[in-house]
Amino acid sequence: MPGVCDRAPDFLSPSEDQVLRPALGSSVALNCTAWVVSGPHCSLPSVQWLKDGLPLGIGGHYSLHEYSWVKANLSEVLVSSVLGVNVTSTEVYGAFTCSIQNISFSSFTLQRAGPTSHVAAVLASLLVLLALLLAALLYVKCRLNVLLWYQDAYGEVEINDGKLYDAYVSYSDCPEDRKFVNFILKPQLERRRGYKLFLDDRDLLPRAEPSADLLVNLSRCRRLIVVLSDAFLSRAWCSHSFREGLCRLLELTRRPIFITFEGQRRDPAHPALRLLRQHRHLVTLLLWRPGSVTPSSDFWKEVQLALPRKVQYRPVEGDPQTQLQDDKDPMLILRGRVPEGRALDSEVDPDPEGDLGVRGPVFGEPSAPPHTSGVSLGESRSSEVDVSDLGSRNYSARTDFYCLVSKDDM
């Protein structure tokens, strides 16, 4: 049956042309497998390997292993030939083809591996480095702004603690320190940022022990700011017992704020400065530079982070202490007018020493009529007092005296 025996083999491997790039010194196995028609009148199949179209001699760089399996009905035989190639020189590279009964299907092409391309890796590394640099730049530029936003949004509120001042400022009684405190520190913190300061140029810790006045004043303030100038450091307790004094201050107030100056960095031999740098985790150490005078400098942002969170009031709601009480005392009303010296001016703080800031109009109260100067103080004293509604007023004890801030104001 020569027609049956002439049927072309069915190649299983390679199913298509393959390109391999083995490195020098490595080895690779090329597998050629096919189903071949078998029969009593068919010759035994044989596999022949070709390299670049020429018969390949076995030996040297090559090794050959052949296997065959016959079907149960003896109609086909599975022929497999595995060519082992040792890539020891560049002469081994080329196109390898297996041929069965002078019929070949696909080939293996061995190519020399070119130099490894590191372009992708270099580009990826540069992108990662650029991203890290950008993140570091954003952290340096925006860190304080993000911290300020977080403090304003989620910081601890320290309003209803009974304290009158946001910070106690201790400084030396010398012209330079007075100018710094009164013309730079106080205007920036009080007028621009709404804090209330208590200024004191007396010795903070005479004989390294707090005085009675200091204890009282610190109890009225939420923070302690020390202007650590050269004149301040010249005090006796700063040179001889600063460690003991610092321990006393840490007992009296939370995380005191020390303002140092750039000129002191050149001479860090003072024991107080060395001690503060060693205990940065217990205190807030700020550095004043020549460029810190601008309102947008990082110095003021760091000071604001160290000070309590400020609560912004809505002026339309007025004083939260009296907004629900309709507290209009008839003793202050003379013939439907407000006496001189008690005009309801919403822009003037009626309690400048207190902690409520500028009060707005009382909730539900009509605006005060424009004041006329026709009534003098002497005439006011001689006028009759309108007491017609005294009996209808509630004079019971006030229960909301210390509820200065409602939840809506937070």
Swiss-Prot record:
PROSITE patterns: IG_LIKE, TIR
Pfam family, one: TIR
Transmembrane segments: 119-139
Disordered: annotated segments: 340-390
InterPro entries per the UniProt record, alphabetical: Ig-like_dom, Ig-like_dom_sf, Ig-like_fold, IL-1_rcpt_fam, TIR_dom, Toll_tir_struct_dom_sf
Extracellular topological domain: 1-118
Paired cysteines (S-S): 32-98
Gene Ontology terms describing biological process: acute-phase response; cell surface receptor signaling pathway; negative regulation of chemokine production; negative regulation of cytokine-mediated signaling pathway; negative regulation of interleukin-1-mediated signaling pathway; negative regulation of lipopolysaccharide-mediated signaling pathway; negative regulation of Toll signaling pathway
Domain Ig-like C2-type: 9-109
Alphabetized SMART domains for the sequence: TIR
GO cellular component annotations of the record: cell surface; membrane; plasma membrane
Keywords from the named record: Disulfide bond, Glycoprotein, Immunoglobulin domain, Membrane, Phosphoprotein, Signal-anchor, Transmembrane, Transmembrane helix
Domain TIR, first and last residues per copy: 163-307
Cell compartments where the protein resides: Membrane
Residue ranges that the UniProt entry lists as topological domain Cytoplasmic: 140-410
Expression triggers: Down-regulated during inflammation by inhibition of an SP1-mediated pathway.
Function statement: Acts as a negative regulator of the Toll-like and IL-1R receptor signaling pathways. Attenuates the recruitment of receptor-proximal signaling components to the TLR4 receptor, probably through an TIR-TIR domain interaction with TLR4. Through its extracellular domain interferes with the heterodimerization of Il1R1 and IL1RAP.
Subunit details: Interacts with IL1R1, IRAK1, TLR4, TLR5, TLR9 and TRAF6. Upon IL-1 stimulation found in a complex at least composed of IL1R1, SIGIRR, MYD88, IRAK1 and TRAF6. Upon stimulation with LPC found in a complex at least composed of TLR4, SIG1IR, MYD88, IRAK1 and TRAF6. Interacts with PALM3.
Record-linked PANTHER family: INTERLEUKIN-1 RECEPTOR FAMILY MEMBER, SINGLE IG IL-1-RELATED RECEPTOR
Family stated for the protein in its record: Belongs to the interleukin-1 receptor family.
Stated name of the protein: Single Ig IL-1-related receptor
Source organism per UniProt: Homo sapiens (Human)
Lineage: Eukaryota, Metazoa, Chordata, Craniata, Vertebrata
